[in-house]
Amino acid sequence: MLERLKKSLLEAPVFKRGEYDYFIHPITDGVPEIRPDLIREVTANIVRIANLDVDKIVTVEAMGIPIGIVLSILCDIPLVIIRKRKYGLPNEVEISQVTGYSRSQLYLNGINRGDRVIVVDDVISTGGTLQATLDSMELAGAEVMDTVIVVERGNGAELLRSKGYNLKTMVRVKVEGGRVSEVEPGISK
């Protein structure tokens, strides 16, 4: 299961961004190309493991978008994209995002009090983006029914699980020696 994803991660190039070893992969970066068979495998697995009894799918710009769009089409559930640009719409929620290599603001629109949502994204490392996303759902009054992340690395997922969040991941990667050295099954319960 997830053989295409695992193989492609093991083949992913890695470069340094400051002190951070950053792997480049179609699901997490859209580079060199997002192949239909890979995105199909990933989204089919989300359908298999996720609670999709929800009103909306929520994802974060940029690389959560391909996953969210395909999942939205497969499941006929509307998609809300947390954006990097302020729109100034009523009830817009501003989110402070801190990742392993940057700080920025994100903006949530389209979530109403009482909405039942699933959060999907491409990767979790430090957990900063996901923590900000989950906090914004609470501020907006939404109920997060499930959270599914494709690639787990670092300790961010464990940190959020220790805070009581239900977080599913498909694979866990280890990056060392300038390459993705291990790809193990994630936690999908």
UniProtKB/Swiss-Prot annotation:
Any Gene Ontology CC annotation: cytoplasm
EC annotation from Swiss-Prot or TrEMBL: 2.4.2.8
A Pfam family assignment: Pribosyltran
SUPFAM superfamilies per record: PRTase-like
Family in the record: Belongs to the purine/pyrimidine phosphoribosyltransferase family. Archaeal HPRT subfamily.
Record's function text: Catalyzes a salvage reaction resulting in the formation of IMP that is energically less costly than de novo synthesis.
Protein name per Swiss-Prot or TrEMBL: Hypoxanthine/guanine phosphoribosyltransferase
